[in-house]
């Protein structure tokens, strides 16, 4: 499949999270600490996963990076830019594709361009991205006519058409069956390798994190801190039954078990 020639590989940016903490107000009026002094650097074009117990603050960190929340303390930078709000240079894909049911697949992908007021100039890119995610034959279809994996590919195309330097993936494959999930892991990797976008993936699936990532950040229960960062030095494509793969899996399980007991 041909990949559209785009500037996004050159536009991939670094990310820095500097001593960030985040608290919310609990129903009883007390402070509820979600994140505690998180510091993290992500290289341009890197694929990094966040793994940790449910409710530990992984999605909160992603929302801070997206500019949808503000930190209680610390700061975040995308490249040299202080993150102070949402930006088209930071795309976000959720577990639910959030497609507009009354719009065709083509028009769902166009939404981001329309919001930025550049649809007329870049209308041709919609066709390119339909081809990129293998849905050119479904351009006139509606979301209810797609499978879960196909709908998630539309969500990825909608995020990527803005050429974000950073793409944030919040459990985007979590609702899919095991077979479709593995196929979509390869699909996301293909898009990442073709476009060079910096990607951060939140996942509860340890095998998914190892299969896809350059590095894996292990987070503690709330208030989340970084327990350890693991370099995944395995050749691609990766074999889930390889002894080195299984050794990393064992290490992560032990870290998560230790973090929950600490």
Regions found by a protein language model. Give the residues of each.
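The feature captures the beta-strand-to-loop junction immediately N-terminal to the Walker
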Residues: 51-53
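Helix-to-loop junction immediately C-terminal to a conserved catalytic motif
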Residues: 66
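Conserved ABC transporter NBD signature motif
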Residues: 74-86, 122
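Short coil-to-helix segment of the ABC ATPase nucleotide-binding domain corresponding to the Q-loop/switch region
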Residues: 103-111
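Conserved ABC ATPase "signature" region
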Residues: 110, 117-138, 190
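Conserved signature/switch motifs of ABC ATPase nucleotide-binding domains
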Residues: 141-144, 162
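Hydrophobic anchor residue at the start of the ABC signature
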Residues: 156
């Amino acid at each position: 499949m041909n990949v559209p020639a785009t500037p996004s590989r050159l536009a991939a940016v670094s990310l820095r999270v500097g001593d960030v903490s985040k608290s919310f107000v609990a129903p009883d009026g007390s402070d509820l600490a979600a994140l505690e002094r998180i510091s993290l650097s992500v290289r341009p074009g890197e694929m990094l996963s966040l793994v940790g117990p449910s409710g530990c603050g992984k999605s909160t960190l992603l929302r801070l990076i997206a500019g949808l929340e503000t930190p209680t303390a610390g700061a975040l930078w995308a490249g040299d830019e202080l993150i102070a709000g949402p930006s088209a240079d930071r795309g976000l894909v959720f577990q639910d594709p959030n497609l507009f049911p009354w719009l065709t697949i083509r028009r769902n992908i166009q939404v981001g361009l329309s919001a930025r007021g550049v649809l007329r100039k870049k209308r041709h890119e919609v066709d390119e991205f339909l081809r990129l995610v293998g849905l050119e034959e479904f351009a006139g279809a509606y979301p209810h006519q797609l499978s879960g994996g196909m709908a998630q590919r539309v969500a990825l195309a909608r995020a990527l058409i803005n050429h974000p330097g950073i793409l944030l993936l919040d459990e985007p494959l979590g609702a899919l069956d095991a077979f479709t999930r593995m196929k979509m892991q390869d699909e996301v990797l293909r898009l990442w390798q073709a476009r060079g976008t910096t990607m951060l993936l939140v996942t509860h699936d340890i095998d998914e994190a190892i299969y896809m990532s350059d590095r894996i950040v292990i987070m503690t229960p709330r208030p989340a801190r970084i327990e350890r960062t693991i370099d995944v030095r395995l050749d691609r494509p990766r074999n889930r039954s390889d002894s080195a793969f299984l050794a990393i899996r064992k290490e992560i399980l032990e870290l998560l078990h230790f973090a929950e007991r600490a």
